[in-house]
């Protein structure tokens, strides 16, 4: 079993241009002072459901109002422009909101609390089901957890004998294009958690999901190392902006 780190390097991949900032998805106009009652976000949510609202409108309902002199819709748009998407906002910390004008500490912490609730609800759902039979749930969770991160993150999902989640951990962090992953440490962690199987994943901040040569080397090294302790590597997922690459579905190239 090798001691050295496997370096994941995305630099040799063709990078995709970052997607545009989140756009309005609902048809109602967001023009200050020109709202009809039936176009108000709160009324539309009550009458039609939350799914009809745009990302901006959802944030507006959470914020309620801006500070004096700051329109709440402008604040919501600024948030989306800064992070690019609601998904990317899930990874925000209080520091990321520190210089944001228009909302105070109470609203900033409220936003962070709601985002954390979304993450935890996904983890709870995964703990109650066999992840072997729920690949979509795993991919959705990983998109939310690491899909919008500006640096490469390597995540390990340790599973029990019934393929239920024991723990999800960030095993390594890197830069925009590379990171060092130590297979030996992941194997040790699998042993300490008495895991029967494992799903690993990492993101490509460029948005492209095609695995690099180093991604393939790491996958084979980790798979061989886990086989020695009778732990199955179920899959290695590469998380991009809008898609996911599965080594298992691709036949473990």
From Swiss-Prot:
Keyword Zinc tagged: yes
UniProt-listed Gene3D superfamilies: 5' to 3' exonuclease, C-terminal subdomain, Cytidine Deaminase, domain 2
SUPFAM superfamilies hit by this protein: RuvA domain 2-like
Binding site residues for Zn(2+): 202, 204, 215
GO annotation (BP), single: proteolysis
A GO molecular-function annotation: metallopeptidase activity
Matching InterPro entries: MPN, RadC_JAB, RuvA_2-like, UPF0758, UPF0758_CS, UPF0758_N
One Pfam match: RadC
Domain (MPN): residue spans on this chain: 131-253
Residue ranges annotated as motif JAMM motif: 202-215
UniProt keyword list: Hydrolase, Metal-binding, Metalloprotease, Protease, Zinc
PROSITE patterns in UniProt: MPN (PS50249), UPF0758 (PS01302)
Sequence similarity: Belongs to the UPF0758 family.
PANTHER family in alphabetical order: DNA REPAIR PROTEIN RADC, UPF0758 PROTEIN YEES-RELATED
Protein name, entry field: UPF0758 protein Bxeno_A3578
Species: Paraburkholderia xenovorans (strain LB400)
